[in-house]
């Protein structure tokens, strides 16, 4: 009887740990071919396809970059992409993965990877626009070389928070702070945009480092193309799910303790700019949503 009881206890503990692990992170992404979810939007000839469309390589030259977007628009969900950044001298280039709506007071959720001179690290800039207002930049260095291997970059967006992930590590959280008078993206469907383009007027050292076109073409690589969201192309009200979708469940309304520790690690080790702590920009009081930032 004692042996059976002990075995039962072990099973319960293991089941609890497994359940906690599942709750801690978004559902496992389903990787599909490019054409399943996406279409090119400009400079079609600057995208090359491999492995039957499972992998693509956007190209940037002195004439143009390129981009792609999904076939539908989405309101809430989990969106991810495996990306390998432009290697070598990538100064002046920007590789972008972001969500955006389509009107003047638009919402937007940005990953922007800012290229640099050979040997210097990439900078990952994130930003959040709500009701047409942005200016919420945060910048970090990555703890790996993003040009060597594919890494997954993902966005979890629900009615409670927006979480930016690098692989399984949360690097930023933007909480719903409507009670503080801060707008939150909740009623404008967004498309997922991806692009490789020249931004040497600002991208590297504030525009001091220009794109060296003798190094062109600049080539990034994408795969994965995961979308698990509520398609709202026809009727956005359909996506007002009131807790019916997996991303609305209680375990996804805040980070768990382990995720907060990982986020704190990123903040302490790799953050190089956070608008919430920019006293030159905000000499008297930081923006109200910064009150929800546990590390400040």
Swiss-Prot record:
Site for Important for catalytic activity, residues: 110
Keyword Phosphoprotein attributed: no
Entry's EC annotation: 2.4.1.207
Residues holding xyloglucan: 112, 125-127, 135-137, 201-202, 206, 281
Pfam family, one: XET_C
One GO-annotated biological process of the protein: cell wall organization
Single annotated GO MF: polysaccharide binding
Enzyme class: transferase
Protein's UniProt name: Xyloglucan endotransglucosylase/hydrolase 1
Disulfide bond positions: 230-239, 276-290
Keywords: Apoplast, Cell wall, Cell wall biogenesis/degradation, Disulfide bond, Glycoprotein, Glycosidase, Hydrolase, Secreted, Signal, Transferase
Modifications made to the protein after synthesis: Contains at least one intrachain disulfide bond essential for its enzymatic activity.
Positions of the GH16 domain: 24-222
């Amino acid at each position: 009887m004692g042996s059976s009881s002990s075995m039962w206890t072990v099973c319960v503990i293991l089941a609890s740990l497994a359940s906690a692990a599942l709750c801690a992170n978004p559902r496992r992404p389903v990787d599909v071919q490019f054409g399943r979810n996406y279409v090119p939007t400009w400079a079609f000839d600057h995208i090359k396809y491999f492995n039957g469309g499972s992998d693509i390589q956007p190209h940037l030259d002195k004439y143009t970059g390129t981009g792609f977007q999904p076939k539908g628009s989405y309101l809430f969900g989990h969106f991810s992409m495996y990306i390998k950044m432009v290697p070598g001298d990538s100064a002046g280039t920007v590789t972008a993965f972001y969500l955006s709506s389509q009107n003047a007071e638009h919402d937007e959720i940005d990953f922007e990877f800012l290229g640099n001179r050979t040997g210097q690290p990439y900078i990952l800039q994130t930003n959040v626009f709500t009701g047409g207002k942005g200016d919420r930049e945060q910048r970090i260095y990555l703890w790996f070389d993003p040009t060597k291997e594919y890494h997954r970059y993902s966005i979890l967006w629900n009615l409670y928070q927006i979480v930016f992930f690098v692989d399984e590590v949360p690097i930023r959280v933007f909480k719903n702070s409507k009670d503080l008078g801060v707008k939150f993206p909740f009623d404008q469907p967004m498309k997922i945009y991806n692009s490789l383009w020249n931004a040497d007027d600002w991208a590297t050292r504030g525009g001091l480092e220009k794109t060296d076109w003798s190094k062109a073409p600049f080539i990034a690589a994408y795969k994965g193309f995961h979308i698990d969201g509520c398609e709202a192309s026809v009727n956005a009200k359909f996506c007002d799910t009131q807790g019916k979708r997996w991303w609305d469940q209680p375990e996804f309304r805040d980070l768990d303790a382990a995720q907060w520790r990982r986020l704190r690690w990123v903040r302490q080790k790799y953050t190089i700019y956070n608008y919430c702590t920019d006293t030159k920009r905000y000499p008297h009081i930081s923006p109200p949503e910064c009150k929800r930032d546990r590390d400040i």
